[in-house]
From Swiss-Prot:
Gene3D superfamilies: Large-conductance mechanosensitive channel, MscL, domain 1 (1.10.1200.120). Homopentamer. It is found in: Cell inner membrane. InterPro entries: Mechanosensitive_channel_CS, MS_channel, MSC/AndL, MscL_channel. GO terms for molecular function: mechanosensitive monoatomic ion channel activity. Keywords: Cell inner membrane, Cell membrane, Ion channel, Ion transport, Membrane, Transmembrane, Transmembrane helix, Transport. It comes from Pasteurella multocida (strain Pm70). Belongs to the MscL family. The lineage of its organism: Bacteria, Pseudomonadati, Pseudomonadota, Gammaproteobacteria, Pasteurellales. It holds the Pfam family MscL. The keyword Metal-binding does not apply. This is Large-conductance mechanosensitive channel. GO terms for cellular component: plasma membrane. Channel that opens in response to stretch forces in the membrane lipid bilayer. May participate in the regulation of osmotic pressure changes within the cell.
Length: 133
């Protein structure tokens, strides 16, 4: 089997394609949530906390010296990232909960079909019925 053919079979399996689609959608979803947090949630939270811009929150560890920039601990950006994570984790939790609920629904139970009798069994049944008469 050629390398290309093996790779094509691997790539076209359902699980690999599903995973690739999930990664692409997840990346896009992450960008949407980051925008939601950075452009909507954090400004509102900043207004509620007295006009604080979370992007600018930092602690200066070492002052700037000449052309060397200051060393800062940017905890405001960290707070934004934590909000991103919480929203994404909550959305994933809701999706997994919905999928588990769908999986838990009881599958339809197939009633067993009556076994098909072989030719010998059919003949023996007919003979038995004739002898009963």
């Amino acid at each position: 089997m050629s390398f290309v053919k093996e790779f094509r079979e691997f790539a076209m399996r359902g699980n690999v394609v599903d995973m690739a689609v999930g990664v692409i959608i997840g990346g896009a979803f992450g960008k949407i949530v980051s925008s939601l947090v950075g452009d909507v949630v954090m400004p509102v939270l900043g207004i509620l906390t007295g006009g604080v811009d979370f992007k600018d929150l930092s602690i200066v560890l070492k002052e700037a010296a000449g052309e060397v920039p200051a060393v800062t601990l940017n905890y405001g950006a960290f707070i934004q990232t934590v909000f991103d994570f919480v929203i994404i984790a909550f959305a994933i939790f809701l999706m997994i909960k919905a999928l588990n609920k769908l999986k838990r629904e009881e599958p339809k139970v197939e009633e067993p079909a009556e076994p098909k009798l072989s030719n010998e069994e059919v003949l023996l049944t007919e003979i038995r019925d004739l002898l009963k008469k």
